[in-house]
């Protein structure tokens, strides 16, 4: 998911497998972005939501196509938030092109709604929802995701999330 991106992601697959190369090159064409430069080279764009989401989904689907090419096919797919798009595409619910172009638009809209540096998220590990609600009371932070037992994500203005994180 978002936050897991890093320069160089998918580069080894791109260089070794034509199937992965095709996904990256097609994404570059569909989005009119140089996905190789975005994903493989150090740059400031990779951490901006409007680029991050397309980069992560492109990388995920490129790797999945290589796995599929080697005869492995999932019986079930699942994803959370951004990962849902990969899961849906892998399951055949949408094309690779639609998944990548949709998350690019999603990222642009999210960036417009909350420009870089204004909002934040933090995973809280080991506290239950009631305790977290007590901690964030009086701040502008909110509960966002119940990821799994023992991990809840808070979100809000950057200063509110930082304030809640210190508590």
Model-assigned labels for residue ranges:
Residues 3-78, 154:
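Helix-rich "cap/lid" substructures immediately adjacent to catalytic or cofactor-binding pockets
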Residues 3-5, 29-31, 91-167:
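Alpha/beta catalytic cores of group-transfer enzymes, especially the acyltransferase/condensing modules
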Residues 22, 55, 81-82, 94, ...:
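An amphipathic alpha-helix/helix-turn recognition signal
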Residues 37, 50-54, 62, 90, ...:
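Short amphipathic alpha-helical patches
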Residues 43-44, 78-82, 107, 119-123:
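Short, glycine/charge-rich beta-strand/loop segments that flank catalytic centers
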Residues 56, 63, 84-89, 109:
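Hydrophobic side chains within alpha-helical segments
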Residues 60, 75, 79-83, 87, ...:
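Gly/Ala-rich beta-loop-alpha elbow adjacent to hydrolase catalytic centers
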Residues 65-70, 88-94:
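Alpha-helix C-terminal capping segments
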